[in-house]
Amino acid sequence: MARRARGRRAGGKAGTEAGPRRAKRSRRTSPKVSKSYASGAGGAGSIEQAAVEAALALAERGPWARVTLGDIAAEAGLPLATLMQEFPSKTAILGAFQRGIDRTVLEAGEVGEGSARDRLFELLMRRLEALRPHRKALASIAAAAPQDPVGVLCGWSRLLHSMSMTLALAGISAEGLPGLIRAKGLAAVYASVLPVFWRDESADLSRTMAALDGRLQCIETIMTWLKGRSRAET
């Protein structure tokens, strides 16, 4: 993003997590995720929205590992059998949540300004802003990961899909083996920023932005070095 890039150059190097640069965001949108869940006025769409909102509410109130599908059905005001027709597991509900986040990112449109790094920064911050209202719930879900290896594998697969989408939206190829490698690298960057994001209480998410900017800069530096070495060897 050109405005962000100019601000970064004017303020020097990105701050560290211990002393982050107070970056200013210039977002055109402030996405509301909850409206993205429903796929229609009724039927499966309304069940999906009710299930996701109930799951997040329960995760925010207590340990996600203790939440059952029965708890989610009761919180959503749905018969358990009705819920299970659409979502046979908690993992399936989290998948619906992530698809809602993907829709929110896509609905905000493309980013065409700045370098590839700037575009990726904008798109990943767009995703984190959409997650912001649910940070407490998501931190509870993340804390339960060691007890749910199947859920972790499914979550990693969904994250790779989301990162491939992010690359494509930024105008970077996500096809073939090179695209998969890029998606895995971007997923690693994104995942490494989440612990900072969980704890970032600043009004403008400045600590999160500084951490993300620094990690993307590291990846950019490594890729530039690898390209230079490849040319030197040919």
Question: Predicted segment positions?
Answer:
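Amphipathic alpha-helical packing segments from all-alpha helical-bundle domains
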Residues: 150-172, 180-192, 210, 218
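Hydrophobic alpha-helical connector segments
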Residues: 96, 109-143, 147, 157-158
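An extended, acidic
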Residues: 128-131, 139-154, 163-166, 186, ...
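Basic, helix-initiating cap at the start of DNA-binding domains
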Residues: 2-11, 19-62, 70-71
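C-terminal peripheral helix-coil segments that are non-catalytic and often amphipathic
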Residues: 2-13, 18-31, 168, 199-234
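Short, basic, alpha-helical segments at the C-terminal edge of helix-turn-helix-like DNA-binding modules
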Residues: 98-105
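Amphipathic alpha-helical interaction segments
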Residues: 50, 71, 122, 126, ...
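Helix-turn-helix
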Residues: 50, 54, 58-92, 96
